[in-house]
Design a protein with these regions (language model features):
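Generic secondary-structure signature for well-ordered alpha-helical cores
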Residues: 29-36, 100-103, 137, 141, ...
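Glycine-rich phosphate/pyrophosphate-binding loop and the adjoining helix
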Residues: 2-3, 8, 142-209
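Cofactor-binding loop segments of dinucleotide-utilizing enzymes, especially the Rossmann-like FAD-
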Residues: 12, 43, 119-121
């Protein structure tokens, strides 16, 4: 490919200092180092209204910005704190707004490659990752198998949200690069066609079952 891929990072929290946002920034750096152009959608800065299906026709400006950035991307990186065993309400609200993309062709985040990150106070960050994987499938995307659940996040970020653990930094940069690598393959028409064939086969199997 000659054009640089566009990777959008979505996440963070509503807190002034967000560990999940700091993790997302590092992963986006990894994507940029792999040759992609990157855009950050910080949930605190976006300040989205609560999703309302009645407003899909005329969404608020922040929701429009979110939807257009996500729909135009080749791939994404998602990052959420883990609250009560799952993703944050703010992150889920952002995903709810993406429901409005269902009327487009192709719909939702069709064939987009998505890398997943969570930041947890304990060791159960995979629970938030699992929730995100369900959402990726619902939005017709493809989650890369490599995920980064940052456990005991308070230990690997300082009080200003700066990452202090080299091992976690490497994992996050690797995830960013992996999203670019897989998205590059999907950008090849023949690869995308094979991916769609796999998706159609999976739908047929599900219908038969």
């Amino acid at each position: 490919m000659t054009e640089r891929l566009a990777i959008v990072g979505l996440g963070g929290s509503l807190a002034r200092t967000s560990r999940s946002l700091a993790a997302l920034r590092v992963a986006l750096d990894g994507a940029a180092e792999a040759g992609a152009t990157t855009t950050l959608l910080d949930l605190r800065e976006l300040d989205l209204h609560m999703y309302n299906p009645d407003h899909e026709g005329e969404p608020p400006p922040a929701a429009t910005r979110l939807m257009e950035a996500c729909y135009g991307a080749n791939g994404m990186l998602w990052s959420s704190p883990m609250y009560q065993g799952t993703i944050s309400g703010a992150f889920k609200n952002a995903l709810d707004w993406l429901h409005a993309l269902g009327s487009r062709e192709p719909p939702f985040l069709h064939d987009q490659v998505i890398g997943l990150i969570s930041a947890a106070g304990g060791s159960q960050g995979l629970q938030a990752i699992n929730t995100m994987e369900f959402a990726v499938r619902a939005l017709r995307g493809w989650a890369v198998p490599y995920v980064v659940p940052v456990a005991s996040a308070y230990r690997v970020f300082d009080s200003e949200g700066r990452l202090t653990d080299e091992s976690v930094e490497l994992q996050l940069r690797t995830l960013g690069a992996e999203v670019v690598r897989v998205a590059t393959r999907f950008a090849d028409d023949s690869t995308a066609q094979r991916a769609r064939a796999c998706e159609e086969s999976a739908e047929l199997v599900a219908a038969a079952g």
